[in-house]
Amino acid sequence: MREPSKFVFTAIALIWLMAFPRPGAAQALQEIRIGSSVIGFSSLMSYFARDLKFFEREGFDAKIIYAQTNVGLAALTAGNFDYSNLTTSAVEATLRGMPLRLIAVTNAEPLWGIVVRKDITQISELKGKKLGVSSFGGTSYSAALYVLKHFGLRPKEDVTLLATGGTTERIAALKHASVDAAVIPAPGDMKAEQEGFKILMDAGAVYKLPNGGMSTTVTKIKQNPAEVRRVVRALVQATKFFAEPQNKADATKYLTRVFNLDASSTEEFYRRFVPSLSTNGVVELDKIKLIVDGALERGLITKRVEPETLVDFSFVKGL
């Protein structure tokens, strides 16, 4: 009887390896492209999910790609990005007709410090003074309008709003006395504090709109709901992990590395940041309504839109 050939043994071995891969053998990861306009508190959980391999555990090679807000939203709509970690801007784009949906929220409220000179002790003292924002029509502008009105001040009439640029430029405007106060996102507001200014309050204490999460296209939701659910699951699990007290050492280590903070600043940022997180991936629809109200006030839209038409939180249910 003839002995089996080496070819037969090789074929059997290959079949065996394919049927029973080695434990821990690498599986091919699916690349997803996530647009991001900034590395800040609002986008942090998507970077955290990537860097601590929450996306990888769901089978993804997550590429986070920088793009200015309008460019990133256009790329998302065109299919060049699969997802975006923009929330408020994505909802506003949907209001303007882009076929997008907010699918998960990581930050239930923004961390925008109202940074002032040390002699200013309350918001009412901003009457007759100048307040710096990033740009007219941006989210920090909306926050400024809301906070001023909340405390009985009339924007423009009582307080002059000036578009002074990014965080560095707003701090410089404070130092040069071009403005008396500025809306500055954390942890930049803490850096301004180190320059001799004071964080009077967090705008998010009264202006509670979502400011971090994940958005995608209606087409992606319809054509690949299983992928969307896995992306959302990775993001929500990362956010839960970050917020759990037993993981504080990992969370603060990450904050220190990303934002180049000293120990005391890291501790303070962590103290402010964790309560702002949404660990279940959703916010109430009245918070989405704040975005609609802001868009109406700034003239981005001319008629009211129901908040539930702008989001799809079905993917976070049951996680």
PLM features: what roles do these ranges have?
Residues 9-20:
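Bacterial N-terminal signal peptides
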Residues 1-10:
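Bacterial N-terminal signal peptides that target proteins for export
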Residues 20-26:
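Sec/Tat signal peptide C-region and signal peptidase I cleavage site
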